Amino acid sequence: MKRTPFLVTCVVVPSLIGGGLYLEHRRRAAADVPIPVADGRIDVELDQAPPQKRTGAPISLTASDGSGLKLVSIRAEAQVEGPLAFTELHLVFENPESRVREGTFTIDLPASAEVSRFAMKIGSTWQEGEFVEKQAARVAYEDFLHRKQDPALLEQGPGNTFSARVFPIPPRGRKELILTYSEILPASAAYRLPLQGLPEIGSLNVRVHTPRGQARTHELVRKNFSPADDYVIADKGVVEGLSAADLRVVTVRPTAGAGAAEEPIGPTVVLVDTSASRSAGFAEQAEMVAQTLENMGDVPVHVIAFDQTSAPIYTGSAKGFRAGGLEKLRDRKPLGASSLEAGLAAVEGIDKGFGTKRLLLVTDGVVTYGESDGRKLASKLEALRSRGLERADIIAAGGIREKERLDALVAGPLPKAGILVDAAEGGKRIAKRLSKPVLANAEIDVAGAIWVYPKKAIGLQPGDPLVVYAQLPKNVSGTKVTVGTQTFEPKLAEAPMELVERAWAKAKIADLAAHSEDAADAKAQAIELSKRYRVLSPYTSLLVLESDADYERIVARAQAAFKV
């Protein structure tokens, strides 16, 4: 079957607002938003050793003819509170041509990001986006576009990619956008603002406010600057969780099994995603695969590349892959559609004499062809038990990832649980982790909680951070978290309700997607949560129109048509 080239667009964003402002109202000008500044100001330089080099710009606005508009200014404000960070990004793009243009704004956010605001400046006024069911929003956008008015539409794409259709971009003028989001920073994870890969920026101004107990503001100001790396702040304090009324977001580190013996790695099938969604950073991905296999030593491996089809790349000892298979993998090139179903089907074709015990899947989890439902893909993986498969591990590659889908594959359809590990950890560390046992589906409980997410620990190894969300009865103080046989009482700090509430809503939407038996009901509930708590979901968009009357007329009509 001929491999069809697919064009995939992908971009990045990072940053946010400080202090007590966590919930914005429509029609509020950005100039009116107060940004509190903590006492004690220090300068922090760019990170000199990011874990993984990025190819391509993290933020872009591309015109309909494919040409990029110049990013002339970035102003970023971030507030870090324990395991949560809140970021506001103010971006200014410039149209060098003497004609009005329509463009696509794209950005790749952290995997846990919850978008809460998207605004576009029209004239001297900031027009705020409203959360609308996705199809209804598209109908409204097209209607206003044809009327030569000024709409914008922000949607969540594959994984953690967000894109916005923007019109108009004035001739020889500027288009200003604001985007805000919250994200989870587990345990010792640093706050990272993606800048690496951006072209020269006329003005860059970044401020990151760290926890209130330390009251510090980290600042970076540059003119005519081309970032070589991301901006990273590790100064997070000792808070392990946040509370707001009856809601909790906490981080714990289970250590059960830390002294257990290493688990031998048996014959392993290595599935490497070579679809078009992996085009950015494909060379780095191939090198990471080679490094991982080198560190697996004499383990027999069968390496297969897949997109919407599959092709054998190498069979032999893991340590021999660099000499015997790396060049062939590079020559495969990332061109096709993304089909995890095709990859799993390829495992069935391997001779039983190989004695397959392990599966190592290198992918971003993005699916553009074939089965995409995580639970159905897990069932296909479970069917491979009859061929002797015992454990599946996943190396999550690239900045755009479908984490929920990948979690479903490592969650336990096989006799032994596997891990979901970031490709940025590097081949040596990944290979070592593959030989370590996994805390298999340990039950998670929060004493007295009405609701807990996740309900089981997935792909967790001793010492890994685990973020737990919970809703407790009102007026309950303290939080006791149990993971398997271990109990934790994390140190909590009070946080603004709107910040914690949005994290809770995002987790609630993920819980519905993972566990609801009624897909239509889960979607309806997710849309309501998205609109009520201002959290973008796969089922909603942020639609910018010119006036309240426009929302009432166009959106109400479109929503009625789609019975939302």
Give the location of each predicted region:
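Asparagine-centered strand-capping/turn motif at beta-strand->loop junctions
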Residues: 93-99, 107-109
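Short, solvent-exposed beta-strand/turn "edge" segments of beta-rich domains on protein surfaces
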Residues: 75-86, 92-96, 168-173, 459-461
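Von Willebrand factor
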Residues: 262-317, 341-344, 348, 355-363, ...
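Hydrophobic membrane-insertion alpha-helices, especially the h-region
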Residues: 8-19
